[in-house]
Amino acid sequence: MPKLRPGHFYIALLLGAIAATSFAQGAPTFKVDPSWPLEMPNHWIMGAVTGVFVDAQQHVWVTHLPETLTEEELYEQQTPPMATCCKAAPPVLEFDQQGKLVQGWGQGSMTDFTDWPREPHGIFVDHNDFVWVGSYNRHRVMKFTRDGKHLLTLGEYEKTAGSADTKLLGGPSGIWVDPKTNEVYISDGYRNRRVIVFDGASGKYLRHWGAYGNVPDDTERFDPKTMVSGALPKQFSTPHGITGSNDGKIYVADRRGNRIQVFDHHGRFLAERVIAPATLSSGSAFVPVLSPDAQQQWLYVADGTNHKIWILRRSDLEIVGGFGRGGRQLGQMLRPHGMSIDRQGNLYVGEASTGRRVQKFTVQGSAR
């Protein structure tokens, strides 16, 4: 397959290749770690996982949705208790490297919507140790201290005004903070169709852009079925995850657009890669994660519809492999929806829907 040229697109994967897994020479391989995480205290269990992030201390942060747990799963939590287990864990959780729970907070998200991100979606711990949490269904991104003290809110509770608005958000899904500029990049995509950037200290609006670096248009309608024949949406379909590289590039996972788009920090379009174009439903490109080596050679993409992780070579966005398949057994995945990486190159994958867990995949090959 030829190298990807900036501004050029083509279908990257044949229809029959979705279920196959192959590796280019030197591409990393992974093995599930059955010992991670450890059992949580207090009979706590997770709901659908919506975000995962590994911070500078190599601690793993997780957001999940307690409201997705059923009454049967929460018998101990009923009034009066109906059984000896279980209870919903707080929606924001911090685990150490060994998988032991360090803390959990955010219980107020179920009752107090002023200081907590109800229905959290996406989490990021920045270079100043502040914790950013999104709220996709309530249109806010909120900044906290490590122990959960609320500091700043971007957007307003349950208010949205479209992709042209510079104050309100519309279904924020992913967060990345540039350590050099302290700018907050948000994939604003469950309702809006854009990337939007704010100052991380003041919350001041800075800029935004849509697919291909153009002005976003919320009125465009696109039939995903046409992607099978090579058509691509002119607008973002669902910008769902975002990250930045050491060399100044921004990677956006356009979930229902089945693609990764690459920009510079000002929103100038550089390249894109289509992933599993035959994927309908909710799309193939959920979350982008870069490998921790200095060159950031690999780009990993969580695919919550095909239930796997794709491996791309970052230099040309060539798909060089992948791992995972749908299922509930160890090492299988059901709706991988959040993902992050530690400095050793190990991946942490959080599962939404009824997956409701985080698994650690230890790197075996050359991913550092």
Regions found by a protein language model. Give the residues of each.
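Bacterial N-terminal signal peptides that target proteins for export
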Residues: 1-12
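Bacterial N-terminal signal peptides
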Residues: 10-21
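Eukaryotic scaffold repeat domains enriched in small/polar residues
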Residues: 23-368
